[in-house]
């Protein structure tokens, strides 16, 4: 199993060595950031989330999970939410977000250790879930489901393996999953796919990126 090779310390050591800028966050592919953010904005708009246009309302509170330096927080989430919380284990990445208008709480912890105490309208996860094992990802999604406000969404945006199986990357100690594996884990976590699509406009020589909007199969009642 590819995910059995994941080592959280190795992953933290890798990211701690990376520059706190967009190029560092995107592994040298900073030129895809604009297209990525626009694709995410368009995806949310199709779901009625956003601050522009008829029928597209801002949500009250979102959380950027595995936020890094806040590229997505600043480039997207603060435009569609009044407040954005941050979950990111590397402190140097979040230093520039402290005190920024619209940024709420900052949790410097890994996703596997985060226990949300706030109810969110939007939980955003991008290019970070590969650092969780399959079992951790299922547990994490179950926690996210319980932390959603009524009508809330969990968004997952990740690279897709094209080899038909999950692939371990020893450089940052992460796994690139295939679409089938994600769907299997979503089902185990009792999350259903409300909408999904492939990100358009990326270079052909990089892995395809798929975005999913998830909702709980059953509405959680306290």
Give the predicted meaning of each segment:
Residues 1-118, 132-143, 153-222:
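Class I (Rossmann-like) S-adenosyl-L-methionine-dependent methyltransferase catalytic domain
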Residues 124:
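A conserved beta-strand element that flanks and buttresses the S-adenosyl-L-methionine
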Residues 127-131:
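Short catalytic micro-motifs in class I SAM-dependent methyltransferases
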């Amino acid at each position: 199993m590819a995910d059995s090779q994941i080592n959280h310390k190795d992953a933290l050591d890798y990211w701690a060595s990376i520059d706190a800028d967009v190029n560092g966050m995107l592994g040298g592919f900073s030129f895809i950031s604009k297209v990525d953010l626009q694709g995410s904005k368009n995806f949310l708009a199709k779901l009625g989330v956003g601050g522009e246009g008829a029928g597209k309302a801002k949500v009250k509170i979102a959380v950027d999970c595995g936020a890094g330096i806040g590229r997505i927080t600043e480039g997207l989430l603060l435009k569609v939410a009044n407040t954005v919380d941050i979950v990111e284990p590397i402190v140097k990445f979040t230093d520039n977000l402290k005190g920024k208008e619209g940024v709420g709480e900052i949790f410097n912890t890994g996703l596997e250790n985060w226990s949300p105490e706030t109810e969110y309208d939007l939980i955003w996860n991008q290019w970070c879930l590969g650092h969780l094992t399959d079992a951790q990802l299922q547990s994490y999604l179950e926690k996210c489901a319980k932390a959603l406000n009524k009508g809330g969404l969990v968004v997952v945006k990740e690279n897709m393996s094209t080899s038909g199986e999950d692939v371990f990357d020893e450089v940052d100690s992460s796994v690139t999953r295939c679409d089938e594996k994600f769907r299997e884990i979503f089902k185990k976590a009792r999350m259903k796919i409300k909408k999904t699509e492939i990100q358009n406009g990326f270079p052909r020589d990089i892995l395809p990126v798929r975005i999913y909007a998830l909702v709980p199969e059953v509405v959680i009642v306290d």
